[in-house]
Amino acid sequence: MHLNIALWACGALLAVLLAWQQRKCWRLIWQLNGWRGVIQQPVLWLLLCINLHPNSILEKVSQYRVHFQRPLAVLVGTRVLLYIDDPAGMECVLNAPECLDKTFLQDGFFVRRGLLHARGQKWKLRRKQLNPAFSHNIVASFFDVFNSVGNQMVEQFQTQTNLHGQAVKFTAAEDLLSRAVLEVSCLTIMGTPTNFTQLDDAHIAHSYKRLLEISAVRVVKPWLQIRLLHRLLAPELYEESKKCAKLLEDFVGGIVRTKHRNWRLRDAVGGEKSGEDASNGWQRRIFIEQIFQLAANGEMTLEEIMDEAQSMVLVSFETVSNSIMLALLCLATNKGDCQRRLLAEIRALVPDVGQVGLEQLQQLRYLDAFVSESLRLLATVPMNLRHVSRDFRLAGRQHETIVPQNSIVVLDTFNMQRDERWWGANARQFDPQRFLDQEEEQLSKGHNDSGSGEKRRQRDRRHSYSFLPFSNGLRSCIGRRYGLFIMKVFLVKLITNFDFQSDFELEKLQFVENISLKFKNADDILLTIQPKKEST
């Protein structure tokens, strides 16, 4: 009898303590959605549990989100998972000092050290140290590298006879392109030629991609971040991740140690710390040469340099190569005059596509619109997660809304950029015209017909944060210019030399959240790549 009373008392005490810990979470749920938000919690828990896998989570979120009032708060233990898919909410979170850090979920990421996942003051310091390495002038100085590797990539496409006029899998073209982008990353980040454009017999590119896929699983299933549980619950995945990680650590570590040793030797004999002779002048500007100086000043260790190099190579290679492939997919499936207009503009403004210059890129307005539209429709990084370091007010709400400390904010860029509320009735259609300045100027003058009036209303309600290809706010992408320049240079060369066609329909894509956007049915996507008879 006494034992039962004691057990009941302990249970009641634990319930009270749990309720006290959750009080701010329930308050947020109430402030956002009232009783409806409270009643929906069991349904949300169930949906979250049964769809907890990268292969399904993005597709299911896209499917279910319209049935709930958003922003949406889900209670998870003593934390809140706050889902946001509107521009005002994005702006508030991305500019809030309380939301600067990544979440513990992202500790499952393969590269969890370095700028990519640094937190608090460490991130602020490291970002300040690394900003000069990605300045406009520095990135613009890499155009000779972009062009050289881009030309090699075109040669590889031309010599791959199995690609010419035949329907090939999307993944086959992706492999060739991703190796070329990895070559650029290794040259501009670490100053080391790797010849990946021709051959990657060590499977470095594949290992990077595979580790990202495994990282995505560890993010949505955080218990796999514990090594013992990962080894017990997913032994094959654990062994594969261990093997790939070792391969990439040896690859990057070997390059960094060799480059650092040579850098110190040059310094010892009185040579330039930054570099090489004039014939290899671009090497004086590479990322790793600049951060070696930070190490010499005692601001970084060699291990931290390796972390930063690994992080930068991975992010620059994966996001850029994926962005280019997504753009080519949009191009190939477009049945309008997009490809013709791009080719006409390039031939009119770029006399020699073998040496594309920055000034020429800046004149390619339709290419800009095409790139922006592909990044809008198929967001390279579909979702962004932020940790709330202390309570903060979610602005833009009619009533006061306080997001409690330790909440996890999910920023759904993918669905926001395809939402009819911000992009109109054709939000899920590929239409580069929407980004053209000329179209905006025509809309601003105003027309009396209903069509232009509807477009004008779309423009007026479009928030500046409704398009976030490289994030924004306090923690925006440090390599935005770098990524855009590579993407545009490569696209100019590919569009000028090849025709891309596909009978696949974008509406049939099955989306996968693998850190960057992937497709469950990628093997069903067939591309026809035909060399042009008259290449510029």
From Swiss-Prot:
Annotated segments matching region Disordered: 439-460
GO CC annotations on file: endoplasmic reticulum membrane
Gene Ontology MF: a single term: iron ion binding
SUPFAM superfamilies named among the record's database cross-references: Cytochrome P450
Intrachain S-S bonds: none
Highest taxon in the source lineage: Eukaryota
Biased composition (Basic and acidic residues): 439-457
Binding site for heme: 477
Group of enzyme by EC: oxidoreductase
InterPro entries according to UniProt: Cyt_P450, Cyt_P450_CS, Cyt_P450_E_grp-IV, Cyt_P450_sf, Cytochrome_P450_Monoox
Required co-factors: heme
Topology with respect to the bilayer: Peripheral membrane protein
Family annotation (CDD domains): CYP313-like (cd11057)
Compartments in which it is found: Endoplasmic reticulum membrane; Microsome membrane
Keywords from the UniProt entry: Endoplasmic reticulum, Heme, Iron, Membrane, Metal-binding, Microsome, Monooxygenase, Oxidoreductase
Task performed by this protein: May be involved in the metabolism of insect hormones and in the breakdown of synthetic insecticides.
PANTHER family: CYTOCHROME P450 4C3-RELATED (PTHR24291:SF189), CYTOCHROME P450 FAMILY 4 (PTHR24291)
Annotated family: Belongs to the cytochrome P450 family.
Name of the protein this chain belongs to: Probable cytochrome P450 318a1
Organism from which the protein derives: Drosophila melanogaster (Fruit fly)
Lineage: Eukaryota, Metazoa, Ecdysozoa, Arthropoda, Hexapoda
Gene (name only): Cyp318a1
